[in-house]
């Protein structure tokens, strides 16, 4: 289970137990693979908290230090899973070779633009062994609010003050928070600061030893003048609004910030 409430998980457990079967929650000792290289993992307490931008910043910092960095992305398994067992992306042609979806491309292209290699696929032990051959450091770019597949040497977890309280009420996000070495409170430039303080207090309650950082998540728009005074139809990031349960995303914030006259309701 991923990005669901604790209550949801236990209702499912109750259904299973009532039928006489066991319900098991597997921990990191059972599910994480040990790398021969140092691993920095970037995960979150909810979908849409800002993992990808954080992962890319980590890659930028490590590259500036002269490290060979290879990223590994949490799986997005579409299409032929056998053919997608191990995927390596270093050039734009690789995206065509693996027939990547738009969702996959928006995750991989920023790494290619940085001249960084990113792996993904299905067999994550085979992926790791390939990545280790060309990396000084492996960066795990997590998905949803899942735990990292690789045993991290530094575990960074991103929290979202727009959903204050969710860091303690969603699975497996709370486990990520409790295991974190570094917690980043993201989006402080757009959040109510009372919610930032609430999140900070919750972090202190369950993981007082973690290093806590506050981060802005500034929006950039290629042609902001095209928005001002216009009626705008916003197409948001899907997961953030669906299982992420946000009422709005960066698109709405950008439209409002850059002077949209009206947000169009697309419903018939």
Task: Give residue spans per PLM region.
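Flexible phosphate-sensing "switch/lid" loops adjacent to ATP/NTP-binding sites
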Residues: 1-7, 15, 31, 39-44, ...
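N-terminal pre-Walker A segment at the start of P-loop NTPase domains
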Residues: 17-24
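Pre-Walker A adenine-sensing motif
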Residues: 25-34
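Conserved glycine(s) of the Walker
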Residues: 49-50
């Amino acid at each position: 289970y991923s990005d669901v409430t604790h209550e949801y998980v236990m209702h499912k457990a109750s259904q299973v137990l009532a039928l006489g079967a066991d319900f098991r929650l597997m921990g990191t000792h059972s599910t994480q693979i040990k790398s021969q290289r140092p691993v920095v993992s970037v995960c979150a307490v909810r979908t849409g908290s800002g993992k990808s931008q954080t992962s890319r910043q980590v890659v930028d910092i490590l590259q500036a230090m002269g490290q060979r960095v290879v990223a590994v992305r949490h799986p997005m398994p579409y299409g032929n899973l056998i053919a997608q067992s191990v995927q390596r992306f270093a050039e734009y042609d690789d995206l065509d070779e693996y027939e990547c979806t738009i969702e996959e491309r928006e995750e991989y292209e920023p790494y290619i633009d940085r001249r960084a290699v990113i792996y993904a696929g299905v067999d994550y032990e085979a992926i790791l062994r390939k990545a280790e051959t060309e990396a000084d450091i492996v960066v795990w770019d997590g998905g949803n609010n899942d735990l990292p597949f690789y045993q991290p040497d530094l575990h960074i977890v991103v929290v979202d003050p727009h959903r204050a309280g969710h860091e303690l009420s969603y699975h497996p996000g709370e486990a990520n928070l409790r295991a974190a070495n570094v917690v980043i409170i993201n989006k402080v430039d757009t959040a109510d600061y009372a919610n930032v303080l609430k999140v900070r207090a919750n972090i202190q309650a369950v993981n007082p030893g973690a290093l806590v950082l506050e981060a802005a998540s500034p929006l950039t728009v290629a042609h902001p003048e095209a928005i001002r005074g216009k009626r705008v139809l916003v197409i948001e990031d899907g997961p953030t609004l669906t299982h992420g349960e946000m009422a709005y995303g960066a698109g709405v914030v950008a439209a409002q910030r850059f002077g949209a006259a009206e947000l169009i309701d697309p419903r018939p």
